[in-house]
């Protein structure tokens, strides 16, 4: 690895941080609710939990009493439950608006702090050599050019061949794997490992449909078909 190892470490940090944010996407709503610093959102959250506990209490009370023996009390509780449902719906909508604004802020922070710096680093240091080749002719010229200059070399290779008559790699010294190709290979490896883990470990195997026994199959084949009369007309020759 070249002396500029900080570039590689920064790329690994950006990739791992992006994966952590991807894996924890289902928990981010709870984090947004807990990390909201506005006093209005905290007040709405406390009101929501108070009303929710009151609603649960009234439901338990209605289940414990009889509607025939305590009709007035049961009707009063039902009326309160309807009012609580409306209040809970209003507060829930306000909390969702707050969470939506928090998600927008988080998306901007992620864009400014993760996506843009990683993109700038990849463009700025795309020709940085991560691994050097021990020999110049270790691989074919086309492969060496792609690893040294990225996939753009593969696209411009035919033009270079038509202009010079050969694929010149002499200007690609020292020969090795560039940062752009190394990042592409690392991300492809991580995605492949994720796919294998999901398919082999996380996802449950699909069991085949149950097969009918031979005796049941024979019984179905031997069972006579029932004929139904759908018309009462009789035709005479």
From Swiss-Prot:
Keyword presence, Coiled coil: yes
Top-level lineage group: Eukaryota
Annotated GO CC locations: endoplasmic reticulum membrane; GET complex; Golgi membrane
Compartment list: Endoplasmic reticulum membrane; Golgi apparatus membrane
One family name in Pfam for this protein: CHD5
Keyword Membrane on entry: yes
Any GO BP annotation: tail-anchored membrane protein insertion into ER membrane
Cytoplasmic side of membrane: 25-110, 194-237
Basic and acidic residues bias: start-end ranges: 217-237
Residue ranges annotated as Lumenal topological domain: 1-4, 132-176
Signal peptide region: none
Main location: endoplasmic reticulum
Membrane topology, record value: Multi-pass membrane protein
TM ranges: 5-24, 111-131, 177-193
GO MF annotation list: protein-membrane adaptor activity
Region called Disordered, residue ranges: 205-237
Keywords: Coiled coil, Endoplasmic reticulum, ER-Golgi transport, Golgi apparatus, Membrane, Transmembrane, Transmembrane helix, Transport
InterPro entries, A to Z: Get1, Get1_fungi, Helix_hairpin_bin_sf
Protein's job: Required for the post-translational delivery of tail-anchored (TA) proteins to the endoplasmic reticulum. Together with GET2, acts as a membrane receptor for soluble GET3, which recognizes and selectively binds the transmembrane domain of TA proteins in the cytosol. The GET complex cooperates with the HDEL receptor ERD2 to mediate the ATP-dependent retrieval of resident ER proteins that contain a C-terminal H-D-E-L retention signal from the Golgi to the ER.
Family: Belongs to the WRB/GET1 family.
Subunit structure: Component of the Golgi to ER traffic (GET) complex, which is composed of GET1, GET2 and GET3. Within the complex, GET1 and GET2 form a heterotetramer which is stabilized by phosphatidylinositol binding and which binds to the GET3 homodimer.
Name the record gives this protein: Golgi to ER traffic protein 1
Gene name for this UniProt entry: GET1
């Amino acid at each position: 690895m070249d002396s500029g190892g900080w570039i590689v470490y920064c790329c690994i940090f950006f990739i791992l941080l992006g994966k952590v944010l991807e894996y924890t996407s289902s928990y981010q709503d709870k984090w947004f609710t807990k990390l909201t610093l506005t006093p209005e959102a905290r007040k709405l959250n406390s009101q929501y939990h108070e009303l929710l506990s009151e609603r649960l209490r009234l439901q338990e009370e209605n289940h414990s009493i009889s509607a025939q023996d305590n009709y007035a009390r049961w009707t009063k509780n039902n009326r309160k439950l309807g009012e609580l449902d409306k209040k809970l719906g209003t507060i829930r909508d306000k909390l969702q608006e707050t969470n939506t604004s928090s998600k927008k802020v988080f998306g901007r922070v992620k864009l400014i702090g993760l996506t843009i710096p990683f993109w700038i680093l990849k463009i700025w240091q795309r020709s940085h050599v991560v691994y050097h080749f021990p020999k110049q002719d270790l691989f074919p010229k086309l492969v060496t050019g792609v690893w040294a200059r990225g996939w753009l070399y593969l696209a411009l290779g035919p033009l270079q061949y038509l202009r010079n008559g050969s694929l010149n790699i002499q200007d690609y010294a020292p020969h090795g794997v560039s940062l752009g190709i190394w990042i592409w290979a690392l991300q492809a490896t991580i995605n492949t490992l994720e796919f294998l883990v999901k398919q082999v470990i996380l996802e449950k195997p699909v069991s085949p449909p149950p097969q009918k026994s031979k005796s049941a199959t024979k019984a179905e084949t031997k069972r006579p078909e029932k004929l139904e009369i759908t018309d009462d007309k009789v035709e005479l020759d």
